[in-house]
Amino acid sequence: GDYRRQSRGRSCIRRYVFGSVSGLTRKDVPGFIKKHYAFSSIVYDIPDYNARYYAIMRLSIEQDVTMLVTANPSTIVEMQHNAIEYFDKYVEDIENGTLNKDLNIPEYIREELEKDLKPNPKRAAELRRLKEEYYTPLPRHYWPNLQVLSTWKCGNTKVYLDKFKGRSEEHT
């Protein structure tokens, strides 16, 4: 969804993606804010780690994400690894409006996530074009309007931030 607000006289639109720890606090925010996230917080209830991250990227890569928030930068690296490994599957799911049936996702969660999925052949074609052009599409390619990346930058988390260098327009 979109989050619209006034900021110094300008209208701002944001799409949010949150990591797993951030997902816990995200569940407690008011409903009028929740509706503007890239996906339902029920995704964090998926017990299978690989299925959870697949779902996070599947639901996010389809959208024009402008803000990514996660406590631990390892989440960003994991999202990118998933995008590389499953890119073609994401494109297929987006084109068909599906969520990979091979994933170990409890049925009640799958039903909740799939209820809003619709075939999106236009976005699937855009993603295919990105893969043809860049071979390995990066966040700066599929989320060109990503403006904010909020994460920890202390201690050993710097190791993960270094892995993200060059994958976004700027790294600070």
Regions found by a protein language model. Give the residues of each.
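Conserved small/polar residues in nucleotide/adenosyl-binding loops
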Residues: E170-T172
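Active-site phosphate/ATP/adenylate-binding loop shared across adenylate-forming ligases
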Residues: G1-S168
